Amino acid sequence: MAQHDFAPAWLNFPTPPSSTKSSLNFEKHSENFAWTENRYDVNRRRHNSSDGFDSAIGRPNGGNFGRKEKNGWRTHGRNGTENINHRGGYHGGSSRSRSSIFHSGKSQGLHENNIPDNETGRKEDKRERKQFEAEDFPSLNPEYEREPNHNKSLAAGVWEYPPNPKSRAPRMLVIKKGNTKDLQLSGFPVVGNLPSQPVKNGTGPSVYKGLVPKPAAPPTKPTQWKSQTKENKVGTSFPHESTFGVGNFNAFKSTAKNFSPSTNSVKECNRSNSSSPVDKLNQQPRLTKLTRMRTDKKSEFLKALKRDRVEEEHEDESRAGSEKDDDSFNLHNSNSTHQERDINRNFDENEIPQENGNASVISQQIIRSSTFPQTDVLSSSLEAEHRLLKEMGWQEDSENDETCAPITEDEMREFQVISEQLQKNGLRKNGILKNGLICDFKFGPWKNSTFKPTTENDDTETSSSDTSDDDDV
């Protein structure tokens, strides 16, 4: 609507110190509230309160409003939501009255029938500016200190009916960070905030001091916080719903329905400016949990790698013994099991030296894995090896003998060359080299399908170096 009407007031009010308490409570209520309040704020602003809110008299109850005005002011004053309205009432300073929000259905006709009065609006703008200066810097304006005593009892009302305890600390942070434009968009009545608290008695600190919270303030009245949270758990969207009449509440509901289609943008602003207190409170622990999980994952990964290395050493030790016992199995068992394992373990082993920055070890491991994967660990369990061999295409009794070709001398020579290379690199501690050359072809009951021609072999095997492996056997 006519948001530009607010320009002088916003410009004159650079920091909203007061938007802390009143907007805390304000936000507790439904998000439609923000939009409707903005709208009525504009409406009443336009019509300059000529509909019965007497801005020149220091009374919050305007003449024509009668009982409705009382209702609106008394009940919402407790919550600190509607008190935002009565700037004009307190100082004769402004038309910024939102008194009729809950019964806006009834008073809407009044708004529409009124005609804006520009001159009074300008005068009230000037008054507002003076008032802001006085409220922001009470020590500079002694007259102001003396004059609006009734406005200084802010703390009493808020602490008697404290805001939602969850929302208190994080909300204040958000409001301090946001600039006035954001506050205006999200439906915060920044201009009307300062005198927004209810008048309980004429005593109390200055407005400015009352609005700036002390760091340790929230837990001052723990019992009341508890009662407040209980009320909220019951599910009333307005904690002190009992204080205002059902009729007013229903009227607000009806107007909220009318405006609901267009509330989305304001809701978005509300969420961005001040996410719900639960989010704010849970954000920190959630972050720490995530970081902890990350570090745990890394440490677990490193532990697992260490464990793998230890297991490798144990298996290396057991390899020598198992090879003496299982000479007949040695070559063809190691073929399949190591092809499968080496594909997986090659990655692990290459990762560790990269972390340590040891380039020579990396190159050695790459040589080992790409040229001769069979040099790795033998499994201690024969049954597991049998199972693996069957899965990879080994057969117990050769039904297809015609496909098995004898190993040629060229293949044996190639095998010896590769094994010598690896021995130079120091990667072969024991066993397979001498056994591979000694146990000439005691195949036993198992036949290896890798003896097929290399063209078929490419289809059946998985390792990238399979062809050279076949030659090696």
Curated annotation (Swiss-Prot):
Biased segments, Polar residues type: 194-204, 251-286
GO molecular function terms attached to this record: DNA binding; RNA binding
Residue(s) carrying Omega-N-methylarginine: 87
Any one GO biological process: positive regulation of DNA-templated transcription
Positions of post-translational Phosphoserine modification: 49, 274, 276, 322, 381
Region described as Disordered: 1-25, 45-169, 191-342, 444-473
Compartments reported by the entry: Nucleus
Ranges of Basic and acidic residues composition bias in the record: 119-133, 293-329
Keyword set, alphabetical order: Activator, DNA-binding, Methylation, Nucleus, Phosphoprotein, Transcription, Transcription regulation
Keyword Transcription regulation: yes
GO CC annotation: nucleus
Major localization class: nucleus
Low complexity biased stretches: 93-107
InterPro entries (alphabetical): Vasculin_fam
A Pfam family of this chain: Vasculin
Skewed-composition ranges (Acidic residues): 456-473
Protein purpose: Functions as a GC-rich promoter-specific transactivating transcription factor.
Family per record: Belongs to the vasculin family.
Subunit structure: Interacts with GTF2B, GTF2F2, RNA polymerase II and TBP.
Name listed for the protein in its UniProt record: Vasculin
The organism of origin for this protein: Pongo abelii
Protein encoded by which gene: GPBP1
